[in-house]
Amino acid sequence: MINKINKSILIFSVFAFGFFISNLLRSITATLTPALSTEFNLSAANLGLLAGGYFLGFSLMQIPTGMLLDRFGPKKVIGYLLIIALIGTISFAFAKSFAGLLISRIFIGVGVAACLMGPLTGYRVWFEEKYQQRANSWMLMVANFGFVASTLPVQILLPIIGWRSIFLIIASLILISIILISILIPSWETKRDEDQNNNLQNLSHIWKNKFFISLVPLAFFNYGGVQAIQTLWAGPWMLNVTGYDAIQSATGLFWINVTMLFSFLIWGYFLPKLSSKGIDSMRIVKFTLPVSYIILFLIVIMGDKAGATMFTPVSYTHLTLPTRFSV
């Protein structure tokens, strides 16, 4: 257990930097849609597959990553995986075809797969219990700084240096993150083989848990849906349906992600207070998700009149779902 506040802040900052990069890479395709579509003549299906490549690599690695984290710890697992992300990011910057872009995105997804769960694993061991929930909430806030950075800042740089140079800059940030992790993150006590067998048994128990099973469709369709909107489809919608130009679209994405940033702040502040009054997060989910459904329905009905102002409350109400999983 790490008791020194300065050391804890340093560890958090190093992990947060890596997670910031992870989410910058996750959502940057929404801002780059016009540039990539023009250069590679991409269809809507191509764009969807390109954005999904990140999540494909990311999701396939989650269970193996969890086992690796338990055995080898965040320092080694995040560090080595980020090398894969570094390769994927450089490869994306030099890609000459859609296939090259897609393969690179899959590599990026694989490489950043431990950027959240790795820190949470470390916090559980290194931080006092009273600080763990706060650190977890702040990590989710950091994610939205990455989302925000992928909007207007990227759009401003785009005509100046081009999207390929932007990815090379991100690659340099990944390299810095790898170095910081290797130097500043504590080592991990390697677990024995019997502990790995217990991990497999625990995984089996999770998949048999009725409450977990009941939340799987909710996470798949609802949280997955808002991620699809946030990281890709909100941008093309504003460009092709509402008639926004590239700057207006990036501005819309900026405010969507700023809303999400403050939403984590608000939910992080009020959830413990509501919980102390007997109002658990599941009750809040049951209230807020229907609100988001109504807003999504209005977006469909309004068509070209539904701009960023309609997508921002969807971002806010959907953020109750990940808070449920963190309990």
Give the positions of each predicted feature:
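Extracytoplasmic
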Residues: 11, 17-34, 42, 230-235
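Cytoplasmic helix-loop-helix junction between adjacent transmembrane helices
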Residues: 104-142
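Helix-breaking motifs and short loop linkers at transmembrane-helix boundaries and internal kinks
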Residues: 41, 73, 94-99, 302-303
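Juxtamembrane intracellular "pre-TM" segments in multi-pass secondary transporters
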Residues: 2-4, 188-215
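Helix-loop-helix hairpin linking two adjacent transmembrane segments in secondary transporters
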Residues: 139-183
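Extracytoplasmic gate region of multi-pass secondary transporters
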Residues: 29-30, 211-254
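Conserved small/polar residues in nucleotide/adenosyl-binding loops
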Residues: 317-323
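Conserved MFS/SLC helix-loop-helix module at the cytosolic interface between two early adjacent transmembrane helices
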Residues: 61-94
